[in-house]
Amino acid sequence: MTATALEIAQALLRCPSVTPADAGALGVLEALLQDAGFATHRVTFSEPGTADIDNLYARIGDGAPHLCFAGHTDVVPPGEETAWSHGAFAGDVEGGLLYGRGAVDMKGGIACAVAATLDYLAANGGQPQQSGKGSISFLITGDEEDVAVNGTVKLLQWAAERGERFDHCIVGEPSNVEAIGDTIKIGRRGSQSGVLIVDGRQGHVAYPHRASNPIPDIATLITALNDEPLDQGSAQFQPSNLEFTSVDVGNPATNVIPAQARAKFNIRFNDHHTQETLRALVEQRLAAACGNRIRARIEWLPSNADVFVTKPGGFTDLVSAAIADITGRSPDLNTGGGTSDARFIAKYCPVVEFGLVGQTMHQIDERTPVSDLDKLTAIYRGVLERYFR
C-alpha cells in the first residue's frame, strides 16, 4: 500500500524548512520517489549575497506526453510559536484538521501530488502508461518564499540543458478561495516596482522664494499617474493597477524645505503590456505631467515577474473535468493574486496552479481539513488518468 497524502504531509511538516533551510524536507520526497522508480537529482544553486539552495528533480517514464508537478518545500517563519494551538512543525491532527506551517502553502499540495502519483503508478505497472510511453516529473525547490533566485528559475534552466521537455505542468499552490475545486489559476499578472524621484532645492521655510519644494510637485505627479487607468483589462485579466506605497522626504526638521521627495510604487500589469512597454507608458505620462517645470525621474527596480496566461482549452478542460468528477464543481479560471513560480514555468510549457484552499496560509494555526487532502489527491489521480489515457 502506498503512502497517503496525510502521512506524507505530516512527514514534510515535521521538517522545519523555514526558507532558506531545507531541514530534510527534500529528502522525504526523494526517498518516496526513488522507491517508486523515479530517477532523482539533488541540485544546489548559488548566487552571491544569497543562501545556497538545494532543489529536487525527479522523473519516471520516457518521452511525451510529459506532465510535471512543481512546488516548494520552504515555508515562511511561523511567527510567535506560543500563539499556535499546536506546534508549528508538529504535524498534529485534531478535529479532522491538519495543523502546521506549510499545511496549505504548500507541503499539503505536494503531498497530495506525490500520493496520487504513487497510487497511480502502482495501479499501472509502475509506468505512466502501460505502453511505456509518457513521463511524470516533480520539480521541487526550497527557494520560493524568499528571493526566488536559486530555485525554480535555475532548476528549469538546468533541466532544459539536460534535454528535459515538459508538455504541461501543475503547481500545487493553494489556488482555491472557499472550497476545493472552486478555482484554477491559469495565469498571473506581472509585477514591476519603481521609485518616483522629484528634485527640488533645499531652503529655509521663511524664504520659500529661495527654495523649491518637491512635496507639492510629487503630490501633483502621484495624482496624475493615478488618475488615468493604465488599461481596461483583457479577456483573462483585470485592469492593470499602479499603487503608491510610500512617500518620503527624509526630513526630520519643521523649518527646512527638503531637497528631494521620493515615492515608491508597484504596478500589477496584465497581458496588454510587457515590462518594457509598461515602463515606456508610465515614463510618457510622467513627462506629460512634469511639463517644463517639474524635475522628476523614475528608478525602476529589477523584476523577474512577467505576466503569463495559459489559454483555456485542452489542458484546463482536462483539469476541470477531474475536479468536477470529485467535487461536482466547475472551477473558475482565474488570474488574480500575487506572483508565483508558475511565472518561470510558463516560459517552458502551459502551466496551471491548483492546490488546497488558501484561507489560512501564512497565518498562525495554518491548517487544512484532512478531507481536503483526500479530495485533492483524488483530483490529481483523475488528472493522471485522463492525461495518460
Swiss-Prot record:
InterPro entries: Bact_exopeptidase_dim_dom, DapE_proteobac, Peptidase_M20, Peptidase_M20_dimer, Peptidase_M20A. Zn(2+) 1 binds at H72, D105, E173. Binds 2 Zn(2+) or Co(2+) ions per subunit. It holds the Pfam family Peptidase_M20. Gene3D superfamilies: Zn peptidases (3.40.630.10). Its EC number is 3.5.1.18. Belongs to the peptidase M20A family. DapE subfamily. PANTHER family: ACETYLORNITHINE DEACETYLASE (PTHR43808), N-ACETYL-L-CITRULLINE DEACETYLASE (PTHR43808:SF31). This is Succinyl-diaminopimelate desuccinylase. It comes from Rhodopseudomonas palustris (strain HaA2).
